[in-house]
Amino acid sequence: MQHVKIPQDRIGVLIGEGGETMREIEAEAEVRLDIDSENGSVAVETVGDPVRGLKGPEIVRAIGRGFSPDEALRLLEDDMMLFDVVDIDAASRNKNDMKRKKGRLIGEGGRTRELMEELTGADVVIYGSTLGIIGAPQEVDAVRSAAEMLLDGAPHGAVYSFLEEKHNEMKHQGLEYHRFPGGQS
């Protein structure tokens, strides 16, 4: 059994309307969730396939870091799917610096975050003081590198070029998990 702590304001998302989301996670990941809504602690116990069960705590953590339940459940699509977090706070000197860096990661009208998703195929969420990433290893690496470049002060243009390059590399390796608006893969 593993214990995962998530923010209070994400407990409702984890449980879902009438407990629907919680039941879906339990069924898909073959785990049992015991949620303490008082302190945000979630006990995750594997009840079925241990390999799927290992993804249970990651799914809960991903929802806690701002992902929708559907995005978090992508972790079960394939054994290679990863969940990673970039700590914006650790790369910041103070609150104002963190706000500025968060703004750089989001971009004007959310464009930078959108481009990270479009060019890599990963899901990217900025919540609180973290940037969360869900995707295949190459996708996660590309987003993490782009985020670190932006946090280190690289110009947006250079980061977009880097992402285009990674996109083309993945495409040539046949690893393009590109998703198009409308939900068709």
Regions found by a protein language model. Give the residues of each.
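RNA-contacting regions in translation and RNA-metabolism proteins
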Residues: 1-185
